Regions:
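An alpha-helical repeat/solenoid feature that recognizes helix-turn-helix modules
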Residues: 1-19, 23-166
């Protein structure tokens, strides 16, 4: 987005953004999310930013994040994460959803894993769960009580936009 506003990849705001992402990566390779649930969402967005930066110092972080995304893929090929991950401060697995599967797929694509078996399994999950009208089932997840995350309660997790972008 900054590049579309006229900044060059070598400009200070880009360098600072890359440095921030590299400093805030979790030990397991993921990133904490702020607006979506949670580590899958944060990781896919961080990876997109790092990939767009073309910063060579980010290659290890990108690789590590790709390994993490693969490690949390569900047996059905999709991805899912519980809202409890906010309270736990770590990824909490949940049944696969289309929106979180999209985050997993988009994250893997950002790592450069464009022909991996994990990517194929995730895409198959989305195809298998897509309705005849092209949409996916929408589920509601309610974040833990007392959390500022109640801004969108119940939170819609499974809208058509994110899965369709994957």
């Amino acid at each position: 987005a900054l590049c579309r506003r006229g900044l060059k990849l070598s400009d200070l705001p880009i360098d600072r953004g890359v440095a921030y992402l590299l400093q805030t990566q979790e030990a397991d390779g993921s990133w904490y999310g702020r607006w979506g649930v949670n580590y899958l969402y944060g990781s896919f967005l961080a990876l997109r930013g790092l990939r767009a930066s073309h910063d060579r110092t980010a290659s290890r972080a990108i690789w590590k994040a790709g390994r993490w995304i693969v490690s949390v893929q569900n047996a059905d090929g999709g991805w899912g994460e519980s809202c409890a991950s906010y309270g736990e401060g770590a990824f909490v697995a949940a049944p696969s959803t289309p929106s979180q599967t999209a985050c997993g797929l988009l994250g893997l694509l950002a790592t450069g894993q464009v022909e991996s078996e994990n990517l194929i399994r995730g895409a198959r999950y989305l195809l298998d769960t897509q309705r005849a009208d092209g949409t996916w089932e929408t589920t509601a997840r309610i974040p833990e009580a007392g959390s500022y995350r109640l801004f969108a309660s119940p939170r819609r997790a499974g809208t058509t936009d994110l899965p369709a972008s994957a």
